[in-house]
C-alpha cells in the first residue's frame, strides 16, 4: 500500500504533520507520497510558489523515512488528480488517494473523476466528527476507507494572521517562513 496525500500545503501545518503520522500508524503503508499542488490555480491568489511549499513540506517531514515528496504537479497546466495518480501508478502499486471527506461532495466536478473512482481506492479524512453522506458515497461507487482526526488548524487562518498562529507550525517550517519572509503581504 502506498498513500498519495496531495494538497496546497500553503503552509504545511502541525495538523498536516499529525495526519501523516496517523496515516502511517493506522494503515502501515510502504510509503506516503506527499504531492504539493502546482502554481496553476489562478483563483488561489495567495498561493505561494511551489518551491517554497515543497521545501516546507520537506523540512516538516525530513525525519520520516516513509515519506517521499513529489514534484509531479509542478507543471504550468492543471492536469488533475487522475493524471497524477496514473503517473505515480507507473512506479508504485496499490495506490490509495488520501482526500478530505468534504471534497467528495464536489468529486463529480473533478477532471476525469469517473476514471479516478474506477481505478483508485480512497482514504477519506474526516475532521471533527464530519458526517458522511453515505448515499453519495454509494452512488459514486467509491472504494474507500475512513480516517478521523481532530483539528481546528487551518492554513488559511495561519496566512491571515501569521504572528498569532506560529505555534501551529512545525519549528523547521516556522523558521523557514520567517527567514524567507513568506506570507507577510497576504491579504485574504
Curated annotation (Swiss-Prot):
Which Gene3D superfamilies does the protein's record reference?
HUPs
Describe its function. Catalyzes the reversible adenylation of nicotinate mononucleotide (NaMN) to nicotinic acid adenine dinucleotide (NaAD).
Gene name as annotated: nadD
GO MF, any single term: nicotinate-nucleotide adenylyltransferase activity
Q: Which top-level group of life is the source organism from? A: Bacteria
Known EC number: 2.7.7.18
Q: What is the recorded name of this protein?
A: Probable nicotinate-nucleotide adenylyltransferase
Q: Which InterPro entries match?
A: Cyt_trans-like (IPR004821), NadD/NMNAT (IPR005248), Rossmann-like_a/b/a_fold (IPR014729)
Which Pfam family would be a valid example here? CTP_transf_like
Q: Which family does it belong to?
A: Belongs to the NadD family.
Q: Which PANTHER family match?
A: NICOTINATE-NUCLEOTIDE ADENYLYLTRANSFERASE-RELATED, PHOSPHOPANTETHEINE ADENYLYLTRANSFERASE
Q: List the disulfide bonds.
A: none
Keywords of the record: ATP-binding, NAD, Nucleotide-binding, Nucleotidyltransferase, Pyridine nucleotide biosynthesis, Transferase
Lineage at the top is: Bacteria, Bacillati, Mycoplasmatota, Mollicutes, Acholeplasmatales
Amino acid at each position: 500500500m502506498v498513500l498519495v496525500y496531495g494538497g496546497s500545503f500553503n503552509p504545511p501545518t502541525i495538523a498536516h504533520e499529525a495526519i501523516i503520522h496517523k496515516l502511517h500508524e493506522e494503515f502501515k503503508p510502504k510509503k506516503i507520497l506527499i504531492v504539493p499542488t502546482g502554481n496553476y490555480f489562478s483563483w488561489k491568489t495567495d498561493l505561494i510558489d511551489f518551491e517554497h511549499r515543497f521545501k516546507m513540506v520537506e523540512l516538516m517531514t525530513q525525519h520520516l523515512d516513509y515519506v517521499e515528496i513529489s514534484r509531479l504537479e509542478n507543471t504550468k497546466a492543471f492536469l488533475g488528480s487522475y493524471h497524477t495518480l496514473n503517473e505515480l501508478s507507473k512506479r508504485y502499486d496499490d495506490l490509495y488517494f488520501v482526500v478530505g471527506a468534504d471534497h467528495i461532495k464536489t468529486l463529480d466536478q473533478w477532471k476525469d473523476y469517473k476514471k479516478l473512482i474506477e481505478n483508485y481506492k480512497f482514504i477519506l479524512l474526516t475532521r471533527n466528527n464530519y458526517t458522511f453522506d453515505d448515499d453519495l458515497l454509494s452512488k459514486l461507487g467509491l472504494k474507500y476507507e475512513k480516517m478521523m482526526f481532530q483539528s481546528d488548524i487551518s492554513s488559511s487562518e495561519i496566512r491571515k494572521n501569521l504572528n498569532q498562529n506560529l505555534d501551529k507550525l512545525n519549528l523547521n517550517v516556522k523558521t523557514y517562513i520567517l527567514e524567507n519572509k513568506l506570507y507577510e503581504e497576504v491579504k485574504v
